Amino acid sequence: MTAQASEARELAAVIGLEVHVQLETETKIFCGCSTDVADAEPNTHTCPVCLGLPGALPVVNEGAVEAAVKVGKAIDADIPAETTFHRKNYYYPDLPKNFQITQYDSPICQDGELEFSVESERRSVDIRRAHLEEDPGSIKHVREGSGPLESRTCSIERADYTLIDYNRAGTPLMEIVTEPDFRAPGEVRSFLEKLEEVLEYLGVFDATRDGSLRIDANLSLVDASEVGEDGDIDKSVLEDANRTEVKNISSHKGAEQALSFEASRQRKLIQSGRAVEQETRHFNETHGNTVSMRSKEEEKDYRYFREADLPPLRVSHWKDEVPIPELPDARRERFVEEYGLSEEAASKLTSTKQVADFFEDVAERFDANLAATWVADNLLGELNYRDMAITDIDDRFDEVTQLVALVAEDEITAKNAHETVLREMLDTGDDPDTVVDREGLGKTSGDEVQQAVVEAIDENPDAVEDYHSGEGGAINFLVGQVMEKTGGSADPGDVNGLLREELES
């Protein structure tokens, strides 16, 4: 095909994902080593099993199986009566056994589905399979020097040597494999956000853990004419298209960025009449591009065979015995119906399980609309402004509730509570009473407000005349004068009413 003909082709992206999720368990998947390795010295959370020493025998972690069943039920997948483990053979420094224990032809979950929204439009992606496996260790490429190790980590091309930490080796992973149902990088980002939301609600995933979500994405471009109106593509078309696998993606934003770059790269190759190599590429977060790593492996290269040290795992009884909590979509609908919230407010309040739980705690004590305003708008808004997450203040929920109580009990104005007290609480770590006392924000008594109203009227005859002439801004000016006299501690609505009474008397 000539370059001119290639340039005229309209191309469509076909994207499939392999999402590796670290499951939240106390110990590793096949041994008793702790998974709490964030602050541990390298290679201190290891044993003969996760290091693959001769004679060491694996035992399946019940907590990992339970977490996998929860995920399967949440994505409406088929969970077989029995599942098995296999060895995936390949040689890489972070894999101490030179094989990975995973699942091959009998995964614990298959044929699932996950719904999500893209710009308010509902979408659905088929989940081909979700299986259990062990995480490899972690590799750091390092430059020579005298500074801290973290400051000397770099790309493999620039490294003087490489260090391997096997603390992570054996951490339980669930690999979730989608069908190639995505047609745009933005869809991938929305899907990952929804998947992480569901995993967090299930309690099987900790997004704050380093490397807890890693994505491999497969992308190819096909003629747009091959894509049906419903987005379906004939399997033979996909088999003929060369695809690239992009690795080292660790975030929703990174996935969108990596796939946008890769789609553009492939489009330029095709439009110039060149072939797209079937290969594995590495996503460079710093530069926002992908670079070639190696030719893409095929399934046969891994020489899968049954893991003889692990018997078949019977999981049929788990499907009925393992419950799952109310998931975000169901909770969102309930918030709209039960509390009369808007769709927008309900979406904010169910963005994480912790936010939703906190809202319901506050709503039990106070009016639901007041609780929604404080949690969805005030609290989340201030956290977002500071680039903080709800998990950063989960030990201060009682203090936030105490602040809402001051507003509900008319001890402080809503404006001062939000714009002064809440902001200072987040910036200084002080409790609400301390901020209120320091700033003198206790609500002014009725007599003091009435006195300030009279003084404002007496001192501003021009504004009074404007008010009686129908000038709309006059009352706002007088409210401002009263608020200034009371140090902002009066309620503006109350002041407005008192001024009108006094002016009309």
Swiss-Prot record:
It comes from the Archaea. It is an enzyme of class 6 (ligase). SMART domains: GatB_Yqey. Its EC number is 6.3.5.-. GO terms for biological process: glutaminyl-tRNAGln biosynthesis via transamidation; translation. SUPFAM superfamilies: GatB/YqeY motif, Glutamine synthetase/guanido kinase. InterPro entries: Asn/Gln-tRNA_amidoTrfase_suB/E, Asn/Gln-tRNA_Trfase_suB/E_cat, Asn/Gln_amidotransferase, Asn/Gln_tRNA_amidoTrase-B-like, GatB, GatB_C_1, GatB_Yqey_C_2, Gln-tRNA_amidoTrfase_suB_CS. It catalyses: L-glutamyl-tRNA(Gln) + L-glutamine + ATP + H2O = L-glutaminyl-tRNA(Gln) + L-glutamate + ADP + phosphate + H(+); L-aspartyl-tRNA(Asn) + L-glutamine + ATP + H2O = L-asparaginyl-tRNA(Asn) + L-glutamate + ADP + phosphate + 2 H(+). Keywords: ATP-binding, Ligase, Nucleotide-binding, Protein biosynthesis. GO terms for molecular function: asparaginyl-tRNA synthase (glutamine-hydrolyzing) activity; ATP binding; glutaminyl-tRNA synthase (glutamine-hydrolyzing) activity. Pfam families: GatB_N, GatB_Yqey. PROSITE patterns: GATB. HAMAP family: GatB. Allows the formation of correctly charged Asn-tRNA(Asn) or Gln-tRNA(Gln) through the transamidation of misacylated Asp-tRNA(Asn) or Glu-tRNA(Gln) in organisms which lack either or both of asparaginyl-tRNA or glutaminyl-tRNA synthetases. The reaction takes place in the presence of glutamine and ATP through an activated phospho-Asp-tRNA(Asn) or phospho-Glu-tRNA(Gln). Heterotrimer of A, B and C subunits. Belongs to the GatB/GatE family. GatB subfamily. This is Aspartyl/glutamyl-tRNA(Asn/Gln) amidotransferase subunit B. It comes from Haloarcula marismortui (strain ATCC 43049 / DSM 3752 / JCM 8966 / VKM B-1809). The lineage of its organism: Archaea, Methanobacteriati, Methanobacteriota, Stenosarchaea group, Halobacteria. The gene is gatB.
